[in-house]
Amino acid sequence: SIFNFLFTISTFYTLHKFKLDTRYCFFYSLLVAILAYPSAGTPYGDHQSTYLSIIAIFCFILALRTNLRIFWFFLPIIFGIAFLTKQAPTGQIFLIVVFLSIIYFIFNFNLGKITFGIIGSLIFIFIFLAILKIGKIPLSSFLEQYILFPLSVGENRLEFLFPLEFKRIFLRFKLIHLSSLILLIVAIKKVKENYKYLKHDEFLIIFALIGSTFALIAHQLMIINGIFIFFMIPILAGFSHVYYLKYFKNKNYIVYLLIFLSISSTAYYGYEYINKRNFMDLNKVNFKNALDAKILDKKLSGLKWITTLYPNNPKKEILKLQEAINIINKDNRNKTIATDYQFISVILSSYDYSPNKYWGEYHAYPEKGHKYFEIYRNFFI
């Protein structure tokens, strides 16, 4: 995957800019590549927006680390693309960066850096508005469909955060917290030595890393998808490695523990979540029952077919799908295909005119009785 490569190379580049040995940069980046995109066969919007948001975090901390204006230019552009991919967790991580940026510029005012950030923002806004204009998309439709309705969904999702139990927030994600422990120790130690460290670039960098981690944990608790944020372990371990070498040079066994933590967690989650397709709810499915997907269509050649609907008899599901596809193919009228089998239109090489990407309750589209249902219905009628 090109995007997995970009995310991996961004991790490598960022760690390398912190003067971590190239071999370790490669090591941690490789583990990120294993845990990131492979967690789902087809990455969801949650994946894409999360990885873009973390790249934006890299951009922010590199802006502080290198003092280069170019990173302030790209920061709003990356965040903008991430937000248009999916609103959350981009929104939460964006607020963290805005908060830290305000602190940074209060104590390190630099008109040149601010100007570069404004230019990047204006370029993104201009391109965005141009796309709306070319696509004849009213700004009001964008606000209703992409901002207001998702916010109404988010109101219900906030309930998923509670109760705020130690088990749910810390024990469930204990390896993520362990990988960031050195960062937390460094921050507390330096603040105790001198409270002015709170405005230091290094503290802002550590805060950005830990803050974005908690934002991802909160996001993970609010969504109904499988866990996918364990790619943060090698990233946090890599930065822990950087700051451990800087402040604790005498006890090298901690470095070995970080490496062991990264390898063991990658092996565990790679097997339990990626190999077993836990994200797709296939962890209890016997893959020996899977059939060659090209039986359904040659475009699926090279893939194996099995789902949670027919785990013991995938052939029956394929036969039903073939029957349905033949009926749809013989109907020459313009039609809307309402189905969770989103690849049908690809097989038929036709547009399905579906009003929704997903057909799930509560979160995919406004249902009857929802305050935005009339807007949703009138859009298509």
What kind of region is each of these model predictions?
Residues 33-37, 71-89, 93-98, 123, ...:
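Membrane-interface alpha helices of multi-pass inner-membrane proteins
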Residues 5-37, 69-70:
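Transmembrane-helix signature of polytopic, membrane-embedded enzymes
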Residues 109-133, 207, 252-265:
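Hydrophobic alpha-helical membrane-interfacial segments at the cytosolic entry of transmembrane helices
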Residues 10-13, 49-66, 71-79, 98-104, ...:
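Specific aromatic-rich, kink-prone transmembrane helix
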Residues 41-49:
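Short acidic/glycine- and proline-prone juxtamembrane loop motifs at membrane-interface regions
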